[in-house]
Structure formats: structure tokens, C-alpha cells
């Protein structure tokens, strides 16, 4: 459930505060309330340091608060959800999402990975401001190494199907307690 401590599925998960590590729940991970500061280790991810090493390094990361007490957007910590999915199902996050969400909802354009994104001729590019204007950039491949945080691509039609399910209109896919 949402309130299950992730240490029950990932005993290797540690934060700098061991007791805090034992209290981090699935809900904390999904709501970016693990206790870490914003974007912990994103620069290392951008530098192509492998996700498993970054997840292990969370044990040394400074904490901004105790778990559940503050919000700090995460890519590395959020991606622990993929490890939890694998521990529970024995299957990869991307496959579980494809079979349990994309397919039943009819999200035919939804994909995982940068290659799938760039193979499509019609997609919104990320932009950065260079001090004078907004400039389009190519997505950083390294973020696609953490599919739970940054690996999904979806068009507006697929997003409408997803929103409809979140609003409770597809309880065959997303139950009411979600």
C-alpha cells in the first residue's frame, strides 16, 4: 500500500538518517517527500553516473527535512519506484506500465525512451533561456536511464486518456482507492 515503508521491499535503501530511511513510504517517494533537497544528484545523472550508484549515494545526501515533512522534486529518489515495482512483481517498471496502464487505456502513442520520442516527427522540445531568448534543446539521454522519473513520452490524446482514468472514469484500470 501507499503507507508501506519502502525498506520492506528495498532493504538496501538508506538515507543519511537511518531512522528516517525506515519511515520513507511509497507515498513519500511518489509525492517527492523523501526528505531530500530539490533535484538531489541530477547533475551527476546528467554526467552519466549510473542510476544504481546514485541510488546508493542517497545514503550520503544531505536531508532538507525528515521524510513526509517537505517537498523536494526528485528524479533519482522518485525512480526508486521502479526498483519497488521490480521487487514486488519481478518485472520492469516500463513493462508493467505498458501492460497495466498504456494498453488497457488505449494509449497507443505512449512510449518509453528517447529513441522512441525522437523517432516521432511531432513532439514538443524542451527549451532553455540563454539570457536573450528561448532555445530548443535535445532531451538529455541520461534522464531516460531513470524511466519512472523521466522516461515516458505521450501525446495529448494519450494524456487525455490518462487524465480521464485519474478522474475515476476508468476504474477497471485505476481503482478508486488510487
Residue locations for each model-derived region?
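Short, glycine/proline-biased beta-turn/loop segments that scaffold the active-site neighborhood
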Residues: 2-17, 105
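Short, surface-exposed loop or secondary-structure junction motifs
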Residues: 17-178
Amino acid at each position: 500500500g501507499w503507507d508501506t515503508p519502502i525498506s520492506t521491499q528495498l532493504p538496501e535503501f538508506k538515507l543519511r538518517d537511518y531512522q528516517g530511511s525506515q519511515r520513507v513510504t511509497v507515498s513519500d517517494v511518489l509525492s517527492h517527500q523523501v526528505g531530500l533537497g530539490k533535484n538531489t544528484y541530477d547533475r551527476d545523472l546528467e554526467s552519466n553516473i549510473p542510476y544504481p550508484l546514485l541510488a546508493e549515494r542517497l545514503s550520503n545526501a544531505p536531508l532538507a527535512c525528515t521524510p513526509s515533512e517537505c517537498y523536494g522534486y526528485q528524479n533519482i529518489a522518485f525512480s526508486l519506484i521502479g526498483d519497488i515495482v521490480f521487487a514486488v512483481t519481478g518485472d520492469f517498471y516500463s513493462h508493467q506500465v505498458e501492460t497495466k496502464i498504456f494498453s488497457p487505456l488505449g494509449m497507443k502513442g505512449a512510449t518509453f525512451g528517447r529513441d522512441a520520442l525522437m523517432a516521432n516527427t511531432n513532439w514538443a522540445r524542451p527549451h532553455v533561456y540563454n539570457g536573450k531568448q528561448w532555445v530548443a534543446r535535445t532531451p538529455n539521454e541520461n534522464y531516460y536511464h531513470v524511466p519512472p522519473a523521466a522516461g515516458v513520452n505521450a501525446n495529448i490524446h494519450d494524456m487525455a486518456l490518462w487524465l480521464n482514468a485519474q478522474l475515476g472514469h476508468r476504474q477497471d484500470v485505476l481503482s478508486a482507492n488510487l
